[in-house]
């Protein structure tokens, strides 16, 4: 039986279809969920990229106060896997499920390009299919992706070169319990060679490995 996964769709989400497709071709049974839905039936919850509520106030700030946020927090407490990609990462930060802050890129510009990353930690549900120290290539697309380290964090991914001014070139972090992962790069956009590369596939393969252990 395929693990059930869901993609939370906010007003302004624009990577929900990419996330759904990545799940579908990597062994999951995906569903879209809305802001009034329950999350009890899912083993993996993805908060996708985009511009939820137009990034008003701050990116992710309004979405973090939606009704679905209670369901996400409850799922996190129960140990379910949650992955926030780009705007989804911003939402998890705003909810307090991940440490730190995400501010405007140091360049003041929106950055959209493929970047090189280093897998700093492969002992996670999201990266166990990688080798520690493995160099991978995944695209980014954000204007507010500069990670500010407020406390000690479990760094999972790091940019090889500084791309947005993030502290210590941090690209992705994990919560203390190990079940909530936030990252600015888009693994769902790197699952097929046809569209530029498939290093992102290993993220979904890692989750599958973990759920089927």
Curated annotation (Swiss-Prot):
Q: Which residues form the Glutamine amidotransferase type-1 domain?
A: 5-213
Do the record's keywords include ATP-binding? yes
Entry's EC annotation: 6.3.5.3, 3.5.1.2
Q: Which UniProt keywords apply?
A: ATP-binding, Cytoplasm, Glutamine amidotransferase, Hydrolase, Ligase, Nucleotide-binding, Purine biosynthesis
> Which residues are catalytic?
86 (nucleophile), 186, 188
Compartment list: Cytoplasm
Is Zinc there in the keyword field?
A: no
Q: Which pathway does this chain act in?
A: Purine metabolism; IMP biosynthesis via de novo pathway; 5-amino-1-(5-phospho-D-ribosyl)imidazole from N(2)-formyl-N(1)-(5-phospho-D-ribosyl)glycinamide: step 1/2
One GO biological process this protein is involved in is: 'de novo' IMP biosynthetic process
Q: Which GO terms describe its molecular function?
A: ATP binding; glutaminase activity; phosphoribosylformylglycinamidine synthase activity
Principal location class? cytoplasm
Listed under catalytic activity are: N(2)-formyl-N(1)-(5-phospho-beta-D-ribosyl)glycinamide + L-glutamine + ATP + H2O = 2-formamido-N(1)-(5-O-phospho-beta-D-ribosyl)acetamidine + L-glutamate + ADP + phosphate + H(+); L-glutamine + H2O = L-glutamate + NH4(+)
Task: Write down any Gene Ontology CC term.
Answer: cytoplasm
- Record InterPro entries: Class_I_gatase-like (IPR029062), PRibForGlyAmidine_synth_PurQ (IPR010075)
How does the annotation summarize its subunit structure? Answer: Part of the FGAM synthase complex composed of 1 PurL, 1 PurQ and 2 PurS subunits.
Biological function: Part of the phosphoribosylformylglycinamidine synthase complex involved in the purines biosynthetic pathway. Catalyzes the ATP-dependent conversion of formylglycinamide ribonucleotide (FGAR) and glutamine to yield formylglycinamidine ribonucleotide (FGAM) and glutamate. The FGAM synthase complex is composed of three subunits. PurQ produces an ammonia molecule by converting glutamine to glutamate. PurL transfers the ammonia molecule to FGAR to form FGAM in an ATP-dependent manner.
Q: Which NCBIfam families match?
A: FGAM_synth_I, PRK03619.1
What is the protein name for this chain? Phosphoribosylformylglycinamidine synthase subunit PurQ
Q: Which gene encodes it?
A: purQ
């Amino acid at each position: 039986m395929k693990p059930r996964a869901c993609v939370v769709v906010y007003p302004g989400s624009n990577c929900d279809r990419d996330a759904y497709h990545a799940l579908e071709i990597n062994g999951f049974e995906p569903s879209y969920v809305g802001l009034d839905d329950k999350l009890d039936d899912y083993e993996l919850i993805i908060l996708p990229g985009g511009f939820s509520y137009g990034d008003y106030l701050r990116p992710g700030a309004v979405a973090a106060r939606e009704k679905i946020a209670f369901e996400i927090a409850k799922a996190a407490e129960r140990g379910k896997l949650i992955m926030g990609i780009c705007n989804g990462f911003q939402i998890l930060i705003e909810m307090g499920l991940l440490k730190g802050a995400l501010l405007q890129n140091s360049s003041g510009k929106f950055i959209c390009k493929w970047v090189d990353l280093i897998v700093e930690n492969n002992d996670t549900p999201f990266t166990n299919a990688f080798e520690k120290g493995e160099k991978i290539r995944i695209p980014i697309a954000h204007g507010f992706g500069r990670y500010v380290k407020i406390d000690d964090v479990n760094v999972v991914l790091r940019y090889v070169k500084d791309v947005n001014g993030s502290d210590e070139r941090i690209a992705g972090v994990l919560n203390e319990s190990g079940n909530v992962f936030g990252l600015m790069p888009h693994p769902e956009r790197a699952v097929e060679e046809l569209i530029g590369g498939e290093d992102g596939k290993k993220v979904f393969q890692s989750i599958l490995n973990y759920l089927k252990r």
